[in-house]
A protein has these predicted regions:
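Conserved HGGG/HGGXW glycine-rich cap/lid loop of the alpha/beta-hydrolase fold
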Residues: 11-52, 70, 88
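Conserved acidic catalytic loop of the alpha/beta-hydrolase fold
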Residues: 54-70
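Conserved serine/cysteine hydrolase catalytic core
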Residues: 155, 165-209, 213-229
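Flexible "cap/lid" loop of the alpha/beta hydrolase fold
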Residues: 91-92, 96-131, 168-172
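Conserved alpha/beta-hydrolase catalytic His-Asp/Glu region
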Residues: 133-180
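Catalytic active-site module of serine/aspartate enzymes centered on a nucleophile-bearing elbow/loop
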Residues: 213-251
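Gly/Ala-rich beta-loop-alpha elbow adjacent to hydrolase catalytic centers
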Residues: 73-78, 82
Length: 251
């Protein structure tokens, strides 16, 4: 059971960071360092990447052990997970999508992405068979930087490629059951040159969600949150200030 409470850090909400496919929780390190320095409790979740409902259930269970208000932050597929896990949890004050999917009920990551030009992820994937007939997907290491992290240093990209965690293929085709961005305030940040999620799709999702603020970073890759950790942190703290901290100040 976690005991990270808002009251332990001057009534600031706990920020829960959820990575997506082909990454892992250390991808948030630059953001974690800044948030901790600013007095925010933080949890960088190890997203199982086993399926939308399974991952959302995992996150929802983790949230039960965190006291006080929460700001959920999702990168890539992690955006799908936060959008579903927040269903029925009135302590989730804000959703922040960092190069992340904000899907509507019935939509899938693969299905919606396929409606837009510019995504090249499929060309880079390597599949491995799992017992029972399922498949795990990785990005081929020699294609990783160009596809996923072109604005990250060569050394760091190589490290990310080596430590990436796979996603089960079926997760990308699993329909979403909840779209909490319709009722929870949302913020969006993404890179102009994202090759996983085309920029036109990012713009569509942010506009559809009625985002409080949308930040589009010129030259940014799908992993734009790593080199631009300061801007990501600023947006998260803005979301906290506009929701949790604003309410506390009015009390």
């Amino acid at each position: 059971m976690l005991h990270l409470t808002a009251s332990s850090s001057g009534d600031k909400p706990t920020v829960v960071l959820v990575h997506g496919a082909f990454a892992e929780s250390s991808s948030w390190n630059g953001v974690v360092d800044r948030l901790l320095g600013d007095g925010f409790p933080v949890v960088a979740v190890a997203n199982p990447l086993r399926g939308v409902q399974a991952d959302a259930d995992y996150l929802a269970g983790l949230l039960e052990g965190i006291e006080g208000p929460v700001v959920l932050v999702g990168h890539s597929y992690g955006g799908i997970v936060i959008g579903q896990a927040a269903e029925g949890n009135d302590r989730v004050a804000a959703l922040v999508f960092i190069g992340g999917y904000a899907l509507d009920v019935g939509e899938t990551a693969a299905g919606l992405t396929g409606q837009y030009e510019g995504g090249t992820l499929g060309e880079t994937l390597v599949a491995f068979d799992l017992p029972g007939g399922a498949k795990d997907l990785y990005i081929a290491q020699d294609k990783y930087r160009a596809q996923f992290s072109a604005d990250v240093s060569e050394l760091e990209s190589a490290r990310m490629a080596a430590t990436q965690r796979p996603i089960v293929e079926s997760a990308l085709n699993e329909p979403v059951r909840a779209a909490t961005w319709k009722t929870i305030p949302s913020w969006f940040l993404f890179g102009e040159l994202d090759k996983n999620i085309p920029v036109a799709l990012h713009r569509f999702m942010a506009e559809r969600a009625g985002a409080r603020r949308t930040v589009e970073l010129a030259g940014g890759s799908h992993s734009v949150g790593i080199p631009e950790a300061a801007q990501v942190t600023e947006l998260i703290e803005e979301a906290a200030a506009a929701t949790v901290l604003a309410t506390a100040g009015d009390a």
